[in-house]
């Protein structure tokens, strides 16, 4: 008996693709020009749709114990880490070139010279997928690859989902959604 292929959500894949393009544009506006207003919401849309797809693909397996939270996290890490390491290597090479040439970083608000100790520390924390206690890049993202803040948070949320979310009751889910809605409204009013 053959297994049927996993269900694909073609429309959702398309919407996620468009959201990903907005995200790339937002992170590379020096190449593409000013980002469209409210394009930051594409990150939220992308994560919401990705959460749906992940819950569909892994939720039942996690709930039934067919796969462990550890297996799920290894699969997520294996999916995210290779491309992230490539981006990390490119950014490290970029900063090393700036250091060798004695040029300040153009993507730091302070336009300061590169400190090799900070660069090495940021590279080590980056390889561990952890934020550094300082930033070499724009807007205090605390990662050598500044968009990596979102990947770090995605892995944290994936860990929470794998451990508790897939087995949450309706009452627990409603409570988490209510608290999240309040936090989101406070953040929206603040920022």
From Swiss-Prot:
Entry keywords, A to Z: Cell membrane, Membrane, Transmembrane
Superkingdom field: Bacteria
Ion transport found in the keyword field: no
Predominant localisation class: membrane
Keyword Signal on entry: no
Subcellular location: Cell membrane
Cellular component terms per the entry's GO annotation: plasma membrane
Record GO terms (molecular function): acyltransferase activity, transferring groups other than amino-acyl groups
Induction text: By certain acidic polysaccharides found in carrot root extract. This induction may be regulated by the polygalacturonase.
InterPro entries assigned: Acyl_transf_3_dom, Acyltransferase_3
Pfam families: Acyl_transf_3 (PF01757)
Function: Seems to regulate the surface properties of the bacterium in the presence of plant cells or plant cell extracts.
Similarity section: Belongs to the acyltransferase 3 family.
Name of the protein in question: Protein 2 in picA locus
């Amino acid at each position: 008996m053959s297994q049927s292929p996993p269900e694909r959500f073609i429309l959702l894949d398309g919407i996620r693709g468009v959201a990903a393009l907005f995200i790339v544009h937002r992170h590379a506006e020096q190449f593409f020009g000013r980002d469209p207003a409210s394009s930051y919401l594409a990150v939220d849309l992308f994560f919401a749709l990705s959460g749906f797809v992940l819950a569909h693909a892994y939720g039942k397996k996690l709930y039934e114990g067919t796969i462990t939270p550890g297996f799920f996290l290894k699969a997520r890490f294996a999916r995210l880490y290779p491309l992230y390491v490539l981006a990390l290597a490119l950014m490290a090479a970029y900063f090393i070139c700036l250091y060798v040439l004695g040029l300040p970083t153009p993507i730091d608000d302070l336009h300061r010279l590169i400190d090799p100790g900070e660069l090495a520390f940021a590279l080590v924390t980056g390889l561990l997928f952890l934020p550094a206690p300082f930033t070499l890049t724009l807007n205090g993202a605390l990662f050598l690859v500044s968009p990596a803040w979102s990947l770090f948070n995605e892995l944290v949320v994936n860990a929470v989902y794998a451990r508790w979310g897939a087995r949450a009751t309706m009452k627990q889910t409603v409570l988490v959604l209510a608290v999240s809605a309040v936090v989101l409204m406070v953040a929206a009013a603040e920022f």
